[in-house]
Amino acid sequence: MYDIAVIGAGVVGGMIARTLSAYDVSICILEAKNDVATGASCANSAIVHAGFDAKEGSLKALLTVRGSEMMEQVCRELGVKYKNNGSLVIGFDEEDAKTLEGLYQRGCANNVKNLRLLSCDELRALEPNISKNATCALHAPTGSIVCPYELTVASVGNAMDNGADL
């Protein structure tokens, strides 16, 4: 008999199991497939989103921003490669510029740190090889990437080291 059953051994299930395994509880991680990270987690984009696209004030916004802020330390603890390369949303015309302004306002409301709108010149200084048609951008320096497969394997492994069963 277990105190907690974590359903799914993807990146979310792995991180939940890892976090809960720090407490004095018995945990069973249940996975339908024959290995961890074989579903959506192995096929996702690897982007750690900054949080500017989530609905203002939503739980998703809160957790995305907080998760983005935590990810570097979590990866360091688990020995997983983490790259804080930032993210850019590129605009090509006035309509795109208005969309980027909306994303900027939403990101500010969601407390995304250091978010800024870039002019064409600022964009080219940051990314010299960007399309000649690009006119503006939204820059989120807190955006990053991490291999979801490696993160899942490490987090499930850490949970198991702490006594969780898979």
Question: Language-model segments: which ranges?
Answer:
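Proline-glycine-enriched beta-turn/loop adjacent to the NAD(P) cofactor-binding site
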Residues: 10, 33, 46
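Short phosphate-binding/catalytic loops that engage adenosine nucleotides
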Residues: 25, 112, 164
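N-terminal Rossmann-like FAD-binding beta1-loop-alpha1 element of flavoenzymes
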Residues: 2-29
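Helical element adjacent to the flavin cofactor pocket in flavoenzyme catalytic cores
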Residues: 138-166
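Alpha-helical scaffold segments in soluble metabolic enzymes
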Residues: 19, 70, 102, 154, ...
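Short beta-to-alpha linker loops that shape the active-site pocket of alpha/beta-hydrolase fold enzymes
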Residues: 33-35, 123, 155
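Glycine-rich FAD pyrophosphate-binding loop
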Residues: 21-43
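Dinucleotide-binding Rossmann-like beta1-alpha1 core, especially the glycine-rich loop
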Residues: 46-126, 135
